[in-house]
């Protein structure tokens, strides 16, 4: 068994500042064909002084390949993507901290891969997001 770690990228960068009331989508990630377990660590770091409502929602847009038959990967649509986490950067919330980090198990469920969608619910500040996938690959010894 090996442990493979991969940084999720956003237009080839390892982090993305998501503007107030904005949404950003990561580059596509492809699972290793031998992956049998996976988790994703999410990070949200407020670009200013956090206030009430400074939240980031993370949704996962899985792909199982080319459902449309047009030769490209087809991902879950944005409004139907699964909510995997909400991180609150305001310390007075419970939970709430800046930066905020959370690790979430990913059901590999034979998915080919995914994209990550980060939606900033703040009306006043940008929030920088990062994500890292850890896969367990190969036989258990």
Language model features with spans:
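C-terminal interaction-tip segments
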Residues: 1-16, 109-113, 118-141
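Extended, low-complexity, turn-rich repeat/linker tracts enriched in Gly/Pro/Ser/Thr and Asp/Glu
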Residues: 45-55, 66-68, 121-127
